[in-house]
Design a protein with these regions (language model features):
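Catalytic phosphate/metal-binding cores of nucleic-acid and nucleotide-processing enzymes, i.e., regions
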Residues: 1-92
Length: 92
């Protein structure tokens, strides 16, 4: 599964579970490293979507750390985490 396919799978599932989903389509024009997805329902979750072998850039790691340090939730997700991702999206 490609990163783009995995990302779409997350978006489709999240929407079915009542989440609002935001993705910047042309990230070249936005702040470097900002997470791929912002999901909003009863909480806000930022997701950086990676393939199994994909690596975080320093800017991505900085954004994730900053969001979490500010009390937010930012995670790196990979296809092998699918069951955990779905369980988290179902949780209220």
């Amino acid at each position: 599964v490609t990163e783009a396919e995995f990302q779409q799978q997350i978006i489709d599932t999240a929407r079915l579970l009542g989440w609002r989903c935001y993705h910047t389509f042309d990230s070249r024009r936005s702040e470097a490293g900002f997470p791929d997805l912002v999901l909003v329902r009863d909480r806000v979750v930022h997701l950086e979507v990676k393939s199994e072998t994909g690596r975080l850039s320093p800017e991505q790691a900085d954004w994730i750390a900053a969001i979490n340090a500010a009390g937010g939730t930012a995670l790196v997700v990979r296809p092998s985490m699918w069951e955990e991702i779905v369980a988290s999206l179902k949780r209220r």
